[in-house]
Amino acid sequence: MNTVASLFAILPYPQIDPIALSIGPVAIRWYGLAYVTGILIGWWLARRMIANLSLWPGNTTPITEKHLDDFLVWAAIGIVLGGRIGYILFYDLQPVLDNPLVALEIWRGGMSFHGGLTGATLAMIVFARRNGLPVWMLFDLVACVAPIGLFFGRIANFINGELWGRVSDVAWAMQFPTGGPFTRHPSQLYEAALEGLVLFVLLQVLARQFHALKTSGVISGVFICGYALARIFVEFFREPDEQLGYLVGGWLTMGMLLSLPMLALGLWAIWRARRAGRSQEPSGLKG
């Protein structure tokens, strides 16, 4: 056991340049590539899922590949705008008040999942209504592939050496470049595993083996609950943002506070879906 711990202990934090590629004066960062990669892989998988009609209610879906192609731009705008605005409002408003141009520096990081989810949700609602699509069906489709983007986003956080964990002496703790002289939990990797890999596998199993997409809203609810539970759990290992610290009692963080309403919303979505059974979407939620 001590030998295994020693092997982990000598593994340093991998110093990876945040800039993946430079073309003249243009620097392409891993952070931006993570968003693009997550969106494109999610789009590709979503196309395959709508082509598999056996997954959907009545073995048919009104969502076409053309709809997905058109929605790709809406999704990107909703995620980026919502993520950036959410981060500014929830985590770091003062620098933007001092210099509004800071809000445009997306390449430096500073994106909020909760804001990105809000932006993406608004984009889905508007897109569904404009195209006459059942909004819960679109929610479910996007939820099935969203963990892919979460996985790549957390890996990018790790490469950037940001959002590291609390001080720890566990065998796999790392000393991050901006984390001081202490070894810390690689909490970005915990989130990549739970919010990304585990949640993705869970949703795919529910959709493909248990036909959860046939009851609109179940997948959306499980995704929201799954993310909220994973985030609350990892927050116990993640260092809170320096400018905020702990909100209450040395344990409650902003990430926890924002995830608690998500958990309630996810449970409501599952309850609503189970109550509706296999009936059609409520008229108030149709596009």
UniProtKB/Swiss-Prot annotation:
Primary location class: membrane
GO biological process: lipoprotein biosynthetic process
Pfam family, one: LGT
A single cellular component GO annotation: plasma membrane
Chain's gene name: lgt
Pathway, per record: Protein modification; lipoprotein biosynthesis (diacylglyceryl transfer)
Topology with respect to the bilayer: Multi-pass membrane protein
InterPro entries assigned to the protein according to its UniProt record, in alphabetical order: Lgt (IPR001640)
Transmembrane portions of the chain: 26-46, 71-91, 106-126, 132-152, 187-207, 217-237, 251-271
Keyword annotations: Cell inner membrane, Cell membrane, Membrane, Transferase, Transmembrane, Transmembrane helix
EC number, UniProt record: 2.5.1.145
The protein's role, per its UniProt record: Catalyzes the transfer of the diacylglyceryl group from phosphatidylglycerol to the sulfhydryl group of the N-terminal cysteine of a prolipoprotein, the first step in the formation of mature lipoproteins.
Record family assignment: Belongs to the Lgt family.
Protein name: Phosphatidylglycerol--prolipoprotein diacylglyceryl transferase
UniProt superkingdom: Bacteria
Annotated positions binding a 1,2-diacyl-sn-glycero-3-phospho-(1'-sn-glycerol): 154
Localization: Cell inner membrane
EC supergroup of this enzyme: transferase
GO terms for MF: phosphatidylglycerol-prolipoprotein diacylglyceryl transferase activity
